C-alpha cells in the first residue's frame, strides 16, 4: 500500500445532498431477485397464488453465505420466473402484485436477543447486507469477529460515500442518526466478548458538514465513538483505503478483514440493522438517489425493494433520451439494459446519462505514462497485468499475476478514469482476478479429487 493513498479528485455532483428522501407512491407490482447478495441465491418458499404481507419471508437462504428475501409489499405472488443478472447469469425472481394495503406480516416483531448467537441469528434473519455495494451478508461479516485468531479493536463505520452523485447514505445520517447510535449499542452489548474495548470510528468525508455536525452532537457523550473526517477524494470508501486512512494499517491480499484488527460496516447497513432489531421489520425498502445529466428533477426517493427503475424515472422525469442507465455510482456501478429492471438491496443510486455523455472515447495503445499506477490506491500496474495475461504458460502466468498484486484491486476504476488512452483498465484487472479465482477453484477441485 503506497503512502499517498486515495488521491483522485472527481467531480462530486452531489446535487441531491440537501434533498430529504421522498417516499414514492406504492408501485403496482414488485420483482424480487434471489441474488441480491454475495453468495448463493436464496430459494423461494412461496408459490404462485400465495397471499403475502410486508416483511414476510418468501425465500430462504441457501448455502453457507446467503441471505433471505422478504416481501416488500402485501399482495399476491403472480409469478416465479427468471431474469438475467448484471454479470451475465440468471436468477429466479418473485413477482408480487400489490393489493395497495401494505399490511405487515404477523411475524414482524422485535426479535428476542439474549446473547451474541441470538443477535447474529436475528441479523441473519433480517436479510441485511452491505448496502455500500458489496452486498456481503451482514451477519457473516460480524460473525468473522468471533475467530479466536483475530482481535478486533476498531469498528469502521463507512460513511464516506465517495462516489459522485450518490447521497443516500448522507440522507440516512441526516434523517436517522438515532438508528446509527442504536446500531453501535447493539454491537457493544451483544458482541462485547469479541469487540471488548473497541473504538467505533464513523468515517465520513469532509464534504458532508451538516452530517458531521449532527453526528458530533449525537455522540458527544460517547467516548468510544469517533467522528473520523476524511478528505473528499476518491476512493475513500474502498475498505482497504479506509483501513489505511483511518488506522494506518495495510490490508494484505488473501486475508480476512478482521485479521487486521478491524470490522467495517456501511452506515446505512448499521442503521437499518438497528431498525430491524427495534421493530422486527426486515430490509424491505431503501433510499435511492436518482440523478444524472438526463434526469429532469434529481431526487432522493424511498422505494420498496423490487420497484422497477422505470417507476422512479416517472417521478423524476427525464430531460433527454437516455444513452445509458447505471445502477450505483459512475465509477464502479453497473450499466443496465432495461429500465424495467428492479432496484435491489444494494441499489443506492440510479444514474441516467444522455446519449452524448454516455459515449465512450475510442481506446488507443498504452503510452506507458504511469498514471494508472500513480492513482491506483494499491499501486497496481494494469499494463503489466495486461501483458502477463497474454503469457502462454499457465503456471508462469498465474505466478506473475499474483506478483502484480492484482488481487488487491479495489475495483475503484481510478485507472480507467485517468488513462489518456481511454483503455478499459478496470475490466482488465477484473478479468485477471476472475481468472485467478477460477484457477484456484480448479486446483482445489483437482486436489480433492486426487485425495479421494
Residue ranges and their predicted role:
Residues 1-45, 95:
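N-terminal, Lys/Arg-enriched amphipathic/low-complexity engagement segments
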Residues 42-51, 55:
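Short histidine-centered loop motifs in beta-beta connectors
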Residues 52-66, 81-84, 91-98:
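Short hydrophobic beta/alpha edge segments that flank linear recognition/processing sites
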Residues 75-77:
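Conserved hydrophobic positions within beta-strands
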Residues 88, 94-157:
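Hydrophobic alpha-helical hairpins/lids featuring a short glycine-rich hinge
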Residues 130, 155-169, 294:
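Gly-rich Lys/Arg/Thr-decorated short loops/hinges at beta-loop-alpha junctions or inter-strand turns
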Residues 149, 193-194, 199-309, 315-320:
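Hydrophobic alpha-helical positions that pack around
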Residues 347-363, 373, 377-452:
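Ferredoxin-type iron-sulfur electron-transfer modules in oxidoreductases and energy-metabolism complexes
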Amino acid at each position: 500500500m503506497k503512502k499517498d493513498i486515495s488521491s483522485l479528485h472527481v467531480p462530486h455532483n452531489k446535487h441531491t445532498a440537501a434533498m430529504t428522501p421522498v417516499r414514492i407512491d406504492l408501485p403496482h407490482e414488485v420483482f424480487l431477485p434471489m441474488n441480491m447478495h454475495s453468495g448463493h441465491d436464496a430459494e423461494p418458499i412461496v408459490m404462485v397464488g400465495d397471499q403475502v404481507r410486508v416483511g414476510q419471508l418468501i425465500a430462504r437462504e441457501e448455502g453457507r453465505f446467503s441471505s433471505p428475501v422478504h416481501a416488500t409489499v402485501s399482495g399476491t405472488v403472480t409469478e416465479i420466473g427468471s431474469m438475467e443478472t448484471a454479470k451475465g447469469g440468471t436468477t429466479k425472481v418473485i413477482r408480487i402484485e400489490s393489493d395497495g394495503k401494505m399490511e405487515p406480516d404477523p411475524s414482524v416483531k422485535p426479535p428476542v436477543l439474549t446473547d451474541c448467537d441470538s443477535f447474529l441469528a436475528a441479523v441473519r434473519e433480517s436479510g441485511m447486507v452491505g448496502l455500500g455495494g458489496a452486498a456481503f451478508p451482514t451477519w457473516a461479516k460480524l460473525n468473522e469477529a468471533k475467530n479466536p485468531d483475530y482481535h478486533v479493536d476498531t469498528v469502521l463505520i463507512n460513511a464516506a460515500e465517495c462516489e459522485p452523485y450518490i447521497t443516500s447514505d448522507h440522507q440516512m445520517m441526516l434523517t436517522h442518526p438515532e438508528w446509527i447510535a442504536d446500531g453501535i449499542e447493539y454491537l457493544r452489548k451483544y458482541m462485547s466478548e469479541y469487540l471488548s474495548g473497541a473504538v467505533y470510528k464513523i468515517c465520513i468525508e469532509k464534504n458532508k458538514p451538516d452530517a458531521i455536525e449532527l453526528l458530533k452532537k449525537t455522540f458527544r457523550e460517547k467516548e468510544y465513538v469517533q467522528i473520523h473526517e476524511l478528505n473528499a477524494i476518491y476512493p475513500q470508501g474502498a475498505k482497504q483505503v479506509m483501513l489505511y486512512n483511518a488506522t494506518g494499517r495495510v490490508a494484505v491480499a488473501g486475508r480476512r478483514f478482521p485479521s487486521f484488527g478491524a470490522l467495517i460496516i456501511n452506515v446505512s447497513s448499521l442503521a437499518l440493522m438497528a431498525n430491524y432489531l427495534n421493530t422486527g421489520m426486515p430490509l424491505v425498502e431503501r433510499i435511492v438517489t436518482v440523478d444524472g445529466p438526463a434526469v429532469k428533477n434529481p431526487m432522493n426517493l424511498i422505494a420498496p425493494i423490487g420497484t422497477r427503475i422505470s417507476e422512479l424515472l416517472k417521478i423524476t422525469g427525464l430531460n433527454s433520451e437516455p444513452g445509458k442507465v447505471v445502477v450505483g455510482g459512475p465509477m464502479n456501478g453497473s450499466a443496465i439494459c432495461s429500465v424495467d429492471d428492479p432496484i435491489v438491496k444494494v441499489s443506492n443510486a440510479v444514474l441516467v446519462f444522455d446519449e452524448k455523455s454516455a459515449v465512450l472515447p475510442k481506446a488507443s495503445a498504452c503510452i506507458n505514462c504511469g498514471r494508472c499506477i500513480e492513482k491506483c490506491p494499491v499501486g497496481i500496474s494494469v499494463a503489466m497485468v495486461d501483458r502477463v495475461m497474454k503469457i502462454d504458460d499457465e503456471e508462469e502466468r498465474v505466478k506473475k499475476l499474483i506478483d502484480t498484486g492484482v488481487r488487491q484491486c479495489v475495483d475503484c476504476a481510478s485507472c480507467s478514469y485517468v488513462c489518456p488512452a481511454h483503455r478499459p483498465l478496470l475490466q482488465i484487472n477484473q478479468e485477471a482476478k476472475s481468472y485467478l479465482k477460477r484457477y484456484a477453484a480448479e486446483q482445489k477441485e483437482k486436489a480433492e479429487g486426487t485425495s479421494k
